[in-house]
Amino acid sequence: MNSTDFIVIRNDLQQCKVIETQLPDATALPADALLVKVTRFAFTANNITYAVIGEQLKYWHLFPAPDGYGIIPVWGFGEVLASKHPAVAAGETLFGYFPMATHLVIEAADVSKRGLRDGAAHRQEVSPVYNAYARVSGDPTYAGQQGDFRALLLPLFMLSFLVDDFLAENAFYGARRVILSSASSKTAFGLAHLLHKRGIRVIGLTSKGNVDFVTSLGCYDEVVTYDQVAAIPAAEPTAYVDMAGNSALRETLHRHFGAQMVYSGRVGLTHRASEPDEPTLPGAKPVWFFAPDQIRKRAKEWGPGGIDQRFGAAWTELVPHLPNWLDVVERRGPAAVREAYLDTLQGRVPPDQGLILSLAE
């Protein structure tokens, strides 16, 4: 049988196309393998980040593509069409990291009641979280709109949760306020929601076109457009969480706040405008926030299940807000996926939209 795959040129993300890839049919699957139909997946600016840093973080290794091309990984759902693993049945629903494709063959390993892992050799260079699949058949929190929100936000909100935890653990480095760039992005407003609950002042930076949306979220104490950052009073200690990855903006903020910039953390690349050779800046040295480090630290300190318990509570508290913040927009078929991809790449998707896609017509 064939899988329809959406591929991009790794060093020119504007160039994309759909190809057909031959997969083994149900009878020809190797031992313990699963043939999975990718039913739907979320697509956000975060997936563009996966593509931008695909070489460095080995994301391109997850789903092989023709030379020079890559398949962008996405969070979504799959249905097991056929199984050669004795503990996994056809018809099961899986949630995890899938290719932008209609089908995937998984080499099922470490199968438990709650999940399984893809043991394919080419997938083992990335963090284990990217090879894990949750078995979610019959779980209402993974169905319908709840499932869409999980695909759109759960991985991003985990990053929000970890940054919030890191900043609070370090007493915000003495800052009295936290500034977030790309304030309309899902990771940013998830973090703003958590910070706001802690009572620290949160300032969101955004473009003029997104001011109304960011203000409507209710989790930013102040919303400032990028051309007005110099008007922010510079006299008190400030922490900056950079979701945009924009070198010019980062330099402007550091020079404006000077020694009062007590923390400068780089998290995202929504603007994709970073320069490799950046000047030494006043204030705290910009550092990348590396989520796995915080996960390892807290797993050791909090013990088994400690992270899941705390994150689960934060997610449960967030979910009631999401229908007011996001409209889920479903698009199906190769042409619709291509349009959604290019719109996201060019920043044309309204911030209040969450795209749920399928390559199947």
Predicted features, each with a name:
Residues L29-F41, E55-V105, D110:
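Glycine-rich beta-strand-centered segment in the early N-terminal region that forms part
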Residues H196-R250:
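Adenosine-nucleotide cofactor-binding segment
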Residues R296-E361:
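C-terminal hydrophobic helical "lid"/dimerization subdomain
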Residues D12-R40, A45:
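A short N-terminal beta-strand-loop micro-motif at the entrance of redox/enzyme domains
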Residues V163, L194-K197:
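Extended repeat-based interaction scaffolds and adjacent low-complexity, acidic/S/T/P-biased segments
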Residues T252-E317:
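Glycine-rich phosphate-binding loop and adjacent beta-alpha segment
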Residues A188-F189:
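N-terminal Rossmann-fold NAD(P) dinucleotide-binding loop
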Residues Y97-R176:
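NAD(P)H dinucleotide-binding glycine-rich loop of Rossmann-like/cofactor-binding domains
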